[in-house]
Amino acid sequence: MRASGASEVAPRLTNATATVPTAQPPLQLSLQFADARHRSVLGRSKVARWLRAALAAPASITVRVVGEEEGLALNTQWRGQDHATNVLTFAYASQPEVEADLVLCAPVVEREAEAQGTSLEAHYAHLLVHGALHAQGFDHEKPAQAQRMEARETALLMHLGFADPYSLSLRRQSMAPASSAPPRSRRR
C-alpha cells in the first residue's frame, strides 16, 4: 500500500492549461451502492470515463457509495476524524497498476453540491477525479502539493466538460486525504 503523498508517480499534466492525453489506460471497475440515492447519477460508463481521464496507468478500482453511518465509521477508523467526509481513497498500489477503493458518502456529497451551487454529477466527477489522483500518489497536505493537485483536477475536469471546482462559491471544501488504508491482498 502506498501513502497518498508519494511523489514518484509521473504526472500526466504539468499545469491547468496542459493538454490531457487522449489514450486512456484500461480500467477494471467495480461499483457498489450501499446508499443508492444517487445511483442514476453514477452510471457505469460515466464513472469509468471520469476515472480514466485521471489515470496514468491501468487500474483496478472499486467505487463504493455509502450512507452517513458507514462514512462516519470509516473516517473515524482510518483518519481519526469524528465526521463523515465526501471521499476516502484507500490506495493499495500505484505502479505498474493502480489498485484502490474509493468511498463516496452520498449525503455529504449531496450537501456539498447544494452548498456550492453545483450539480451532483459535477461534484461526483470532481470527487472521483480527486480520489483517482490520490490513488496515484497525489496529496494536498502542503500548499505546493495542494496547488499541483488542484491544477491537475481543474485541467481534467475542464477536459471532461465541467467547470473549475475551485472557482465555486465554497472554494476548498475539505477533501479527505488518503494516508491510511486497511491491508488488502492484491486482486488477481
Language model segments and positions:
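An acidic/histidine-cluster motif and surrounding catalytic segment
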Residues: M1-Y124, A135-R188
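Short active-site segment of divalent metal-dependent hydrolases/proteases
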Residues: V129, L133-H134
